């Protein structure tokens, strides 16, 4: 529906038609970076009024998946606040004490320390989960490493393959 900070041509008219015709709709994103509220505000800034209930992110899909697999799960999570909030809202405790899962999403602050901790936790038995299978992601002016690129050093160091959650 948008690229960068611009609506795609016809997007506004299409969404207005969906509302006018009382169609049910949901915007899916394989990004774990933002919360539905933030996505709502971004579209509002672009001139499109869409309720936050119409957004489903890979962070929400990951949190839902984990909460069905392991009620009261614990996780070491590397990712932005969209992921952290989704895990919290799903009742998943984020900590660094024998986590059940290591979860990797898009992260601006990704560093060697994250790789070291994630490797230790996976070697100690934590299950390795990626919020999406994207190797790169588009940004204004090019591409950036995405979830699978951030996951690669952990998979290589542990010899374990991550499970990647699909949001669609």
Annotate each predicted stretch with a short phrase:
Residues 1-168:
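HAD-like aspartate-dependent phosphatase fold
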């Amino acid at each position: 529906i948008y690229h960068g900070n611009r609506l795609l041509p016809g997007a506004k008219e299409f969404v207005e038609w969906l509302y006018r015709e009382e169609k049910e709709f949901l915007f899916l994103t394989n990004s774990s970076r933002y919360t539905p509220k933030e996505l709502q505000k971004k579209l509002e800034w672009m001139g499109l009024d869409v309720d936050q209930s119409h957004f489903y992110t890979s962070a929400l899909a990951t949190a839902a998946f984990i909460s069905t697999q392991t009620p009261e799960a614990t996780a070491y999570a590397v990712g932005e606040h969209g992921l952290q909030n989704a895990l919290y809202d799903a009742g998943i405790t984020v900590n660094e004490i024998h986590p059940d899962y290591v979860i990797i999403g898009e992260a601006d602050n990704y560093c060697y320390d994250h790789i070291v901790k994630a490797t230790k936790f996976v070697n100690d038995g934590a299950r390795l989960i990626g919020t999406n299978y994207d190797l790169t992601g588009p940004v204004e002016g090019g591409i950036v490493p995405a979830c699978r690129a951030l996951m690669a050093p952990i998979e290589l160091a542990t010899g374990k393959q991550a499970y990647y959650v699909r949001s669609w």
